[in-house]
């Protein structure tokens, strides 16, 4: 019987080379492990587009930059992710043809799916909470209209929950918008009413 194969760890430089060799694929990198990002549902794609558009519209001419899921962020020296959306207000992250990763994200957004929800809620939440530039982490549900924002408050993180009819505020970038704008054009239902 053959011995089980040991997991192969790769360096950040090897991961970058893998990304250059496969420009149509996105690979997240966590501490020597590489994870291929898969596509999501149409609702996931639409919500991702809506959140980027909403952030762009509400930020207006502010000196912040909104990015979609094609932009990776450097969470630490050994962790790089592709969130569904992110915002940076750091001049180092001004969009240029040379810049390949966001260095100082302030807001990170993940649209939840069945296959990634556990990773987004636990592993990535821990990574994002450890990144000193990230002030807010927004998770958007696809099973029902529900959003949570995890907000840095000194050394702690506070949880803010939003549902239909609510206005979401992202304090770190000074914007407010209706939860409904995130679900525009989708068939994602409202959460069940617990009062019935």
Region locations from a protein language model:
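Gly/Pro/Ser/Thr-rich low-complexity, intrinsically disordered segments predominantly at protein N-termini
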Residues: 1-196
């Amino acid at each position: 019987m053959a011995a089980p194969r040991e997991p192969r760890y790769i360096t950040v430089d090897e991961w970058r080379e893998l990304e250059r060799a496969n420009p149509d694929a996105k690979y997240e990198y966590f501490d020597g492990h590489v994870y291929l990002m898969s596509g999501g549902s149409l609702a996931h794609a639409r919500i991702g587009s809506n959140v980027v558009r909403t952030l762009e519209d509400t930020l207006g001419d502010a000196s912040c930059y909104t990015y979609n899921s094609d932009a990776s962020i450097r969470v630490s020296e050994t962790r790089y992710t592709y969130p569904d959306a992110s915002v940076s207000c750091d001049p180092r992250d001004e969009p240029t043809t040379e810049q390949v990763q966001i260095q100082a994200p302030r807001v990170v957004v993940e649209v939840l799916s069945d296959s990634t929800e556990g990773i987004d809620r636990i592993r990535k939440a821990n990574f994002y909470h450890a990144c000193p530039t990230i002030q807010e982490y927004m998770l958007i549900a696809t099973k029902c209209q529900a959003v949570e924002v995890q907000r840095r408050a000194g050394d702690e993180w506070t949880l803010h929950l939003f549902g239909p009819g609510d206005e979401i505020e992202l304090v770190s970038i000074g914007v407010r918008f209706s939860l409904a704008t995130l679900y525009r054009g989708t068939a994602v239902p409202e959460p069940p009413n617990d009062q019935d």
